[in-house]
């Protein structure tokens, strides 16, 4: 188990600590089965990871509430905690989540209304 004393740092709020515990519990329970066939079906494994992250509500952190997200606006601390935890469990899980944000972040911040309507809801859903 890695040192998680950083969760007590003052710029993290109780909601961040709860999120870290929630994603860690979820990752321990789900990631091993989700990545079991990664060498036989990499694309399918990534798709399955994103779907599972969506079903669990974690991809909702990659978009603001206006696009179906969990929070009013993107919260970098939440995104970092999710990525750190997923990466600790399996690099492919972090990759699958990160790719969602690489597209949705710029669209959330700078995309047209049409782009936001087209892309953000599907990302939030996983």
Model region roles, listed by residue range:
Residues 1-18:
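Intrinsic disorder at enzyme termini
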Residues 32-126:
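Glycine-rich flavin
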Residues 14-29:
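A non-catalytic, amphipathic alpha-helix used as a structural packing/dimerization or gating element
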């Amino acid at each position: 188990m890695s040192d998680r004393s950083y969760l007590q740092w003052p710029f993290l709020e109780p909601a961040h600590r709860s999120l870290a515990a929630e994603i860690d519990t979820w990752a321990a329970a789900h990631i091993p089965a989700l990545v079991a066939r990664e060498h036989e079906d990499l694309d399918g494994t990534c798709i399955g990871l994103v779907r599972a992250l969506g079903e669990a509500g974690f991809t909702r952190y990659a978009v603001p509430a206006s696009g179906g997200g969990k929070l009013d606006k993107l919260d970098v601390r939440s995104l970092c905690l999710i990525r750190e935890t997923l990466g600790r469990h399996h690099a492919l899980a972090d990759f699958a989540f990160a790719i969602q944000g690489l597209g949705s972040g710029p669209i959330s911040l700078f995309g047209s209304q049409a782009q936001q309507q087209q892309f953000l809801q599907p990302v939030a859903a996983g």
